């Protein structure tokens, strides 16, 4: 196929899609140019079905530093593992694409997005999402798209689609929404305590823009799309399915209704083992043994799936016996750990998270060097999910995509209420350790994080709580669930996480397994989540009503002073010699910003005071009218040089020593003598003149004799 180009304008920027010129051996490939951002997307599919019990979809978002005209960092000077932002963007693209493949599709699919040029005012992630949908849609891969995504900002009461950098910085909302022509199927958002009504409106505005992009894609697919390949779907034998349901469904139904998680798992596992053993014995010698046993396992999974959904939609009974809008039992505790700067333990049913706070000097902030200009990240929220939290063994090591994503969600939720740098000049790190999990662990980490921040004395604007909402839908009827547990998440249609304060929402995240949900469901889920959020906030506020007025004794104390910008080099010294000497002498940490704000950190207040005195003396300037107790350091014929303080000397001219005439300076002063002087002049070169006589009254002039007076009259 020769190169074909499709052009439109979207959100005020040119949008160009090129097909047929590059990556022609992939099943589908596109180059998307949005503004001056350029993204190459290639989609490929394996020829055979994988043997696993899940759909092996891999979406990558690769940031090439040359795209922003930058050299990679590190001694190797080449791109390495994906950045956190790249990982989050890959997840952002994966989530709306995954539901658009048929049930039972098991061929491996890879969608690789490579950022070739980067324009910070034209969203490369949204170009990559468009390219991913298009590459799949024009290929022979059986993808039931297209989908599209947009970013939505909220500035001065107006919604803006795909905002530029300045608009993003002014926005009260950072929303990414994706979906099909008919419905929304993915949401990711941070917000500055916005009400549910505005969030819902933002979603609808975003979906309207999505429909424009889908119409554009449909034109391209009609022009260059390939016929979809015929692939084998994982399907079970109907007669085998009917037999197992008839024989074992009653036993499995009973097991599913056991309320406690571990007991329920044991009961369902016992039924499954019984069935597997029976069919293993029957088909041990059959040449189709492996396929049959795979089918048996899949049928049992489908039976459990169907029963959980039936109980909720028909009987309005959840696996643990709760009402559809009922939260599991809650517990909260602060100061779980000694020595740390703050800690909070939050428990919701069988989900438990411990959050630990660490405060540090601003010099410890994380430096982010990606495609955007380098910047410092003050707040970090890390989420760890050890396998023991679900009673299993498993992999341990670096954080995976899921842990990075859950950590970022908590970070967005809590960042909205943090004090400004001027109010609280610390770098802040929260680490959420999931100790037990039966669903909604990311939201438990947000609640635990609030407890840790308040216990640690961080003056947050308001406490934040999070809740996960679920959905069971048969296409006609649906049920929205509050505080979903693991089984409801696994077998349900939606995982909709909502975090916020009493004033409004600070973060949203939604993933669904169906092709989309309606505005009505979104509205109902947001309203139900608000009720649950307030219930959790009641518990948090009962545990700790407001942030503590003092930091933990182990937290670094801080003091700040302001110096003139031209004095920064004086404090730092040649090659950092002066500041290193201060740090070595006092044991403090010192940060100096470009505006002359000096922050001094230590757990020892005396050390802070000493460092502050040293810095103050280094930048101290003599001022006209001020009096100093000085020491004579040099004597010349024309006057004496005196040291006012540190390395600051002044000249006391011979005429300024006394009101009477001084013949020789050395007759009056000697080196090492201490005298009081008053500064009378500082010239534009910083040279200082001082006076001794200005500190004593001027003696009266002697009166003239009467004789002279009389003579004068004559």
Swiss-Prot record:
InterPro entries: ExoRNase_PH_dom1, ExoRNase_PH_dom2, ExoRNase_PH_dom2_sf, KH_dom, KH_dom_type_1, KH_dom_type_1_sf, NA-bd_OB-fold, PNPase. Residues 691-714 are annotated as: Disordered. Its main location: cytoplasm. GO terms for cellular component: cytosol. Residues 625-693 form the S1 motif domain. It is an enzyme of class 2 (transferase). Its EC number is 2.7.7.8. One of its GO terms (biological process) is RNA processing. One of its GO terms (molecular function) is RNA binding. HAMAP family: PNPase. NCBIfam families: polynuc_phos, PRK11824.1. This is Polyribonucleotide nucleotidyltransferase. It comes from Streptococcus equi subsp. zooepidemicus (strain H70). The lineage of its organism: Bacteria, Bacillati, Bacillota, Bacilli, Lactobacillales.
């Amino acid at each position: 196929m020769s190169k074909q180009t499709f052009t439109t304008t979207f959100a005020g920027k040119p949008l160009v899609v090129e097909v047929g010129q590059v990556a022609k051996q992939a099943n589908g490939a596109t180059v998307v140019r949005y503004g001056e951002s350029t993204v190459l997307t290639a989609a490929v599919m394996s020829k055979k079905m994988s043997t696993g019990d899940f759909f092996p979809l891999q979406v990558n978002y690769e940031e090439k530093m040359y795209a922003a005209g930058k050299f990679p960092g590190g001694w190797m000077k080449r791109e390495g593992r994906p950045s956190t932002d790249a990982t989050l963007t890959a997840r952002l693209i994966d989530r709306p694409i995954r539901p658009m493949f048929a049930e039972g599709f098991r061929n491996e699919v890879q969608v690789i997005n490579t950022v070739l040029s980067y324009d910070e005012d034209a969203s490369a992630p949204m170009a990559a999402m468009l390219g991913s949908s298009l590459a799949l849609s024009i290929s022979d891969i059986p993808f039931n798209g297209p989908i599209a995504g947009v970013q939505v900002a909220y500035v001065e009461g107006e919604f803006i689609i795909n905002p530029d950098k300045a608009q993003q910085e002014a926005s009260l909302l950072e929303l990414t929404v994706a979906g099909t022509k008919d419905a929304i199927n993915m949401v990711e958002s941070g917000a500055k305590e916005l009400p549910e009504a505005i969030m819902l409106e933002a979603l609808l505005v975003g979906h309207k823009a999505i429909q424009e992009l889908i119409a554009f894609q449909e034109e391209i697919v009609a022009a260059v799309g390939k016929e979809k390949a015929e692939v084998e779907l994982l399907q079970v034998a109907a007669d085998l399915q009917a037999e197992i349901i008839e024989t074992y469904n009653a036993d499995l139904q009973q097991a599913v209704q056991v309320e406690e998680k571990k007991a329920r798992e044991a009961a369902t596992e016992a039924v499954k083992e019984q069935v597997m053993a029976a069919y293993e014995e029957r088909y041990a010698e059959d040449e189709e043994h492996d396929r049959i046993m795979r089918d048996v396992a899949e049928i049992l999974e489908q039976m459990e799936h169907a029963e959980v959904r039936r109980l909720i939609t028909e009987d309005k009974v959840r696996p643990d016996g709760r009402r559809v809008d009922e939260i599991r039992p809650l517990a909260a505790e602060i100061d779980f750990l000694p020595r740390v700067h703050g800690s909070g333990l939050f428990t919701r049913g069988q989900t438990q998270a411990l959050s630990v706070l660490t405060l540090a000097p601003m010099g410890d902030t994380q430096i982010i060097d990606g495609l955007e200009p380098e910047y410092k990240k003050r707040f970090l929220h890390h989420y760890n999910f050890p396998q023991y939290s679900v009673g299993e063994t498993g992999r341990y090591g670096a954080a995976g995509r899921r842990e990075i994503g859950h950590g970022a969600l908590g970070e967005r939720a809590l960042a909205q209420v943090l004090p400004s740098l001027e109010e609280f000049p610390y770098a802040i790190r929260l680490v959420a350790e999931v100790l037990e999990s039966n669903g909604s662990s990311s939201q438990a980490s947000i609640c635990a994080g609030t407890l840790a921040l308040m216990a640690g004395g961080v003056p947050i604007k308001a406490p934040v709580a999070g809740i996960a909402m679920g959905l069971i839908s048969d296409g006609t009827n649906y049920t929205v669930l509050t505080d979903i547990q693991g089984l409801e998440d696994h077998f349900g249609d939606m995982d909709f996480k909502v975090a916020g304060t009493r004033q409004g929402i600070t973060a949203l995240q939604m993933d669904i397994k169906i092709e989309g949900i309606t505005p009505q469901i979104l509205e109902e889920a947001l309203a139900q989540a608000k009720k649950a959020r307030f219930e959790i906030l009641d518990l948090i506020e009962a545990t700790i009503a407001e942030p503590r007025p003092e930091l933990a004794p182990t937290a670094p104390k801080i003091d700040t002073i302001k110096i003139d910008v031209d004095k920064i080099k004086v404090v730092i010294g040649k090659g950092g010699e002066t500041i290193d000497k201060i740090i070595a002498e006092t044991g403090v940490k010192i940060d100096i910003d470009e505006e002359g704000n000096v922050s001094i950190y230590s757990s020892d207040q005396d050390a802070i005071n000493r460092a502050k005195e040293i810095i103050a003396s280094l930048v101290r300037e003599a001022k006209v009218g001020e009096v100093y107790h000085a020491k004579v350091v040099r004597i010349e014929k024309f006057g004496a040089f005196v040291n006012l303080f540190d390395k600051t000397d002044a000249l006391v001219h011979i005429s300024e020593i006394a009101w009477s005439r001084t013949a020789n300076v050395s007759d009056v002063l000697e080196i090492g003598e201490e005298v009081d002087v008053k500064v009378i002049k500082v010239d534009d070169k910083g040279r200082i003149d001082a006076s001794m006589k200005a500190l004593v009254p001027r003696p009266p002039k002697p009166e003239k004799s009467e004789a002279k007076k009389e003579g004068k009259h004559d």
